Amino acid sequence: MTRSLKKNPFVANHLLGKIEKLNMRAEKEIIVTWSRASTIIPIMIGHTIAIHNGKEHLPIYITESMVGHKLGEFAPTLTFRGHARNDKKSRR
């Protein structure tokens, strides 16, 4: 289910505060966050946000087409290493 339109999009308060400070000073710097559930809103466009993927922070540049998506969608947490092999060499 999608979020109700009566509610505002979720954005972590600490993340919103950091972005508003940078916008007021007209500065661009990397913002580090663990908040993967935060929704990207229009005031974030043009900033670089380092999103935690469980191991490290991946820097993501926010563009206009990302608005409305969650931050966690752009920092994959799993790496697929391939299916198990069936030959006899891999069993040894």
Curated annotation (Swiss-Prot):
Disulfide bond residue pairs: none
| Recorded GO MF terms | rRNA binding; structural constituent of ribosome
| UniProt keyword list | Chloroplast, Plastid, Ribonucleoprotein, Ribosomal protein, RNA-binding, rRNA-binding
What Gene3D superfamilies does the record tag this protein with? 30s Ribosomal Protein S19, Chain A
Alphabetized NCBIfam families for the sequence: rpsS_bact (TIGR01050)
Q: What does this protein do?
A: Protein S19 forms a complex with S13 that binds strongly to the 16S ribosomal RNA.
Protein name according to UniProt: Small ribosomal subunit protein uS19c
**Lineage, opening ranks:** Eukaryota, Viridiplantae, Streptophyta, Embryophyta, Tracheophyta
